[in-house]
Amino acid sequence: TPSDLFRDWEDRFYIADSGNNRIVVTDSGFSKATRIYDKLKTADGETTLKDPEGIYVSEETQCMYIADTGNSRLLVCDLDGNVQLELTRPDSTLYENETFKPQKVVVDKAGNIYMVLNNITNGSAMFNSDGEFQGYFGANSVDATAEVVANYFWNMIATDEMRANSSRNVA
């Protein structure tokens, strides 16, 4: 089952095929698979993917970034399938969740890695190019003030007409 798709600078498509535990590379017309990554080389042998849900390929680093969801990790591999870096659950006070399930991944030109993680609402988890957890990027928390709670309650009981006539306050 395809769960993500990435088009590279040479018009190749990388497909995260989560149902078959692999990354499939096709030509620009999707007419043939030019490469299948189902086993990746590690320093001590090889590893397999399990339910990969995200793929990103960087022209700058010539690496694939694979959200290997079922194995609770993100793999950084060269285009020959050699694992360069493995990111797992951060050992940080900022990361409070028990699980680490990367679903989608992107990388900026500086090499920073941004991951959407299952059950994380703090934003995208950000790692530097060395794999060190930097915190979250994107979402800010909303303090549950009396006004926020009152607005939430009001929206639960208000009719569509009442909501249409009300104004929205953004601080």
Regions found by a protein language model. Give the residues of each.
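Eukaryotic scaffold repeat domains enriched in small/polar residues
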Residues: 1-171
